[in-house]
Amino acid sequence: MEKAIKEETFMGKDDCIFCKIANGEIPSATVYEDSICRVILDVNPANKGHALIIPKEHYDDIYSMDADTASKIFTIATEVAKAQKAELNPDGLNIIQNNGAAAGQTVFHFHMHLVPRFIKDTVTVTWVPGQSDNEELDQLSKALRK
């Protein structure tokens, strides 16, 4: 299955690997499933318990998803995170969701990563903080409110 995922990551929605996984055409270690999504354990985990939330309907990214579906997915993320906390007792959790190649998206079917974190793990999700000024922040916040 690992090879199949790597070979199909850039295919279109007609041959989408995550559509096939979410709809049960490809076997997976399923943690949760309902009519909206399937939650699986990642076959290439960043850490033990690394889960993926994959909607059954194909959405390329967050920009194409309706707010109701997004809300349901985040509610499921909350429940999965609590289960990870209870079972694995991590020191933290990263919720990661990439949109577009520039953001690191490699499978163009919306999905959310829930990565349990441990004090001495080697997972990195960091960036160098940029700088801004109050005027720039004020202008941008006004533009985004439109």
Features from the language model and the residues they span:
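HIT superfamily nucleotide-processing domains
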Residues: 2-146
